[in-house]
Amino acid sequence: MTVLTNSLTEVAQQTRQAAIQLAGASTETKNQALEAVAQALEAATPEILEANVQDCQQAKAAGIANALYARLKLDATKLKGAIAGVRSVATLEDPVGTVQLKRELDTDLVLSRVSCPLGVLGVIFEARPDAVMQIAALAMKSGNGVLLKGGQEALHSCQALVKAIHQGLSNTAVSPNVVALLTSREETLELLNLDQDVNLIIPRGSNDFVRFVQENTRIPVLGHAEGICHLYVDQAAKLDQAVEIAVDSKIQYPAACNAVETILVHDAIAPQYLPKLTAALQDNHVKVLGDAKTQAIVDVGPATETDWATEYGDLIVSIKVVASLSDAIAHINQYGSGHTDAIATEDDQAAAVFMNQVDAAGVFHNCSTRFADGFRYGFGAEVGISTQRMPPRGPVGLEGLVTYKYQLKGQGQIVATYAGSDARPFTHKDL
């Protein structure tokens, strides 16, 4: 792989040159490349799964945390789903070349704002080999090159995946150099210094890791931090429905960043709801912790102040009884990570207040927090979920990987014509 024989600067420059060519590629060319990549991944499935088994065995021996192991493991079903995600990106509308604004400044002087690729992305992620396929597909469709740096625990899986991607692209009009893999820890720090060649860094990991990246690079950072997600069960909730939402939000994939970590319950329904909830969670092997009011109703372990600010990423959940909707919102805004928070209620006014006042990228009403996902949103896939307030926010798909440029077409006009006492007026007419 070129990344192993060339310096990182050389690799980044090769990726940038390939991205410049890709930026001008037609939608058909990019879609053909994505289909070729999907076919190559299918053909390489045995090698990819074998590499992942090697990674998983080494990770187990090293005592990897359960949450990281769940993200690391790539079975045939998960791989098949990721390949389907690559194909789904090909069906999405091309985000490049969209005319966002067209305005006549004067006769034969027309301004357009047109979407264009960012350039080269640097994506650093933990034990998520499936992220390689998601990110590579989105980068190619949006006309960007990408430098991928996975966690060391996923090294063999990432190498097998990128090898297949390169093989798929080798017979297309898209250069394999648009996707490159970094393999050493030292390259992570070096990547952060490549502000001449990399246009956006996307770190996927803990808050501490994202903060470290932000403090050690001059490159813009799209922060994807922890997912401390909440479910608030209001006094007007349908209790059985709220149990189903809570269980799905916790157990469907507990290692995911959109899994619920804290459940807040209105005290008016706590005596009826908590026994149902804890029984359902414990039947699914979830360790339940609770505040003093929760412990007075059901037999669970104690939740401490630390628990409210913890992303478990595992079959653990904390429960707190609150006196009101406003108390629930205050708790979420204090301890949440701004990822995804949900309310279960039949009171539309309460739901509206919750959805307006909770500060998160995703606010849901009567549904699982697990819906916070680019594929489920119809984005095809995602490079990550941004919890920052500036856009892009939430699951970042194609639209978050393009910027725009202003194109002005004239017939020899000069600014002097439009200045001075007899200045020619602008027409400023939208076309």
UniProtKB/Swiss-Prot annotation:
What InterPro entries would the database entry show?
Answer: Ald_DH/histidinol_DH (IPR016161), Ald_DH_C (IPR016163), Ald_DH_N (IPR016162), Aldehyde_DH_dom (IPR015590), G-glutamylP_reductase_CS (IPR020593), Glu-5-SA_DH (IPR012134), GPR_dom (IPR000965)
List, alphabetically, the CDD domains matched: ALDH_F18-19_ProA-GPR (cd07079)
Recorded catalytic reaction(s): these are: L-glutamate 5-semialdehyde + phosphate + NADP(+) = L-glutamyl 5-phosphate + NADPH + H(+)
Subcellular locations according to the entry: Cytoplasm
Q: Which GO terms describe its biological process?
A: L-proline biosynthetic process
Q: EC number(s)?
A: 1.2.1.41
From the Swiss-Prot or TrEMBL record, what is one GO molecular function term?
NADP binding
Keywords for this entry? Amino-acid biosynthesis, Cytoplasm, NADP, Oxidoreductase, Proline biosynthesis
Major localization listed first in the record, in broad terms: cytoplasm
Biological pathway: Amino-acid biosynthesis; L-proline biosynthesis; L-glutamate 5-semialdehyde from L-glutamate: step 2/2
- CC terms in the record's Gene Ontology section: cytoplasm
Family according to the record: Belongs to the gamma-glutamyl phosphate reductase family.
Q: What does this protein do?
A: Catalyzes the NADPH-dependent reduction of L-glutamate 5-phosphate into L-glutamate 5-semialdehyde and phosphate. The product spontaneously undergoes cyclization to form 1-pyrroline-5-carboxylate.
This protein's name:
Gamma-glutamyl phosphate reductase
Q: What is the lineage of its organism?
A: Bacteria, Bacillati, Cyanobacteriota, Cyanophyceae, Acaryochloridales
